[in-house]
């Protein structure tokens, strides 16, 4: 399995979740709270989504790079979310 096939849906869901949870939630007004929320949401979605996908499809074979791909996809999601956050944050100032 290639990294692009593995990481597209978790990264996409992570970006959408960060947009809806962080940007639509008015109680996270501090930058530090929003950054922590972005990082936590990205890591959780990118680790839990592929794992649940394999458990639901009852595939008992997890390939060697599964956890590496989870970690790399979460890093990609965090970087994309932080770039979007800082672009929108500078535009709002």
Swiss-Prot record:
Annotated compartments: Cell inner membrane
Q: Name one GO cellular component term.
A: plasma membrane
Keywords from the named record = Bacteriocin immunity, Cell inner membrane, Cell membrane, Membrane, Plasmid, Transmembrane, Transmembrane helix
Q: Which GO terms describe its biological process?
A: bacteriocin immunity
The record lists the membrane-crossing segments as 3-23, 36-56, 68-88
Membrane topology designation: Multi-pass membrane protein
Q: Among its keywords, does the record have Transmembrane helix? A: yes
What is its biological role?
A: Probably able to protect the producing cell against microcin N (microcin 24).
Similarity comment text for this entry: Belongs to the MceB microcin immunity protein family.
- Its name, as the record gives it, is Microcin N immunity protein
Biological classification of the source? Bacteria, Pseudomonadati, Pseudomonadota, Gammaproteobacteria, Enterobacterales
């Amino acid at each position: 399995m290639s990294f692009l096939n593995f990481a597209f849906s978790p990264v996409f869901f992570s970006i959408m979740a960060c947009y809806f949870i962080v940007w639509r939630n008015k109680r996270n007004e501090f930058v530090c709270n929003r950054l922590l929320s972005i990082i936590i949401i990205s890591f959780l979605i990118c680790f839990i989504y592929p794992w649940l996908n394999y458990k639901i499809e009852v595939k008992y074979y997890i390939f060697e790079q599964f956890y590496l791909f989870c970690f790399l996809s979460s890093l990609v999601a965090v970087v994309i979310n932080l770039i979007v956050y800082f672009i929108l944050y500078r535009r709002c100032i």
